[in-house]
Design a protein with these regions (language model features):
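Glycine-rich, low-complexity intrinsically disordered segments
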Residues: 1-156
Length: 156
């Protein structure tokens, strides 16, 4: 399971109450009420000569943050995004094991898909969001490793 805590410079905690039954119905998760559930999270950094940071892409269910994300892209709001990844540990419980943090991020693309519930083969209404950012950090919590990259510092 992956979750997102998203805070905007103007709107505050955009992810507030996003994982409640009012927001996402029976998909809600106790203990993660103020986070956005992620269906997928993708990120790419490449290098030919200089390092190239590509937008972070995530897919999420349509929830109560969806209108706020529209406001955010419209106003070019500066965001802080913290993605947390959970896995099942040896005792059968979920444990936080990985964290990805974006600072000075902004939404560059929103693409929404509204499926027909009666014939969608389990696909729920969702949206794909792309975020540009100034810096990114990674932390493998259980293994004790971490790293970061700042876009401006990567021209060689």
């Amino acid at each position: 399971m992956t979750y997102l805590k998203l805070t905007g410079s103007r709107q505050g905690l955009i992810s507030a109450k996003c994982s409640t039954s009012e927001s996402i119905g029976n998909r809600f998760q106790t203990g993660h009420e103020d986070e956005i559930q992620e269906l997928t999270l993708n990120h790419n950094i490449s290098r030919s000569q200089n390092l190239s940071h590509h937008p972070v892409q995530f897919i999420k269910p349509i929830d109560m943050s969806s209108p706020l994300l529209g406001v955010s892209i419209s106003s070019n709001e500066q965001l802080e995004a913290i993605f947390t990844c959970y896995r099942t540990n040896q005792n059968g419980r979920l444990e936080l094991y990985y964290k990805l943090k974006l600072t000075k991020a902004s939404i560059v693309d929103i693409s929404s898909t509204y499926t027909n519930v009666t014939n969608s083969n389990g696909i729920i209404p969702h949206e794909k969001i792309l975020l540009n950012y100034e810096s990114i950090s990674w932390e493998h919590i259980t293994a004790g490793t971490s790293g970061y990259s700042i876009m401006e510092n990567n021209i060689f």
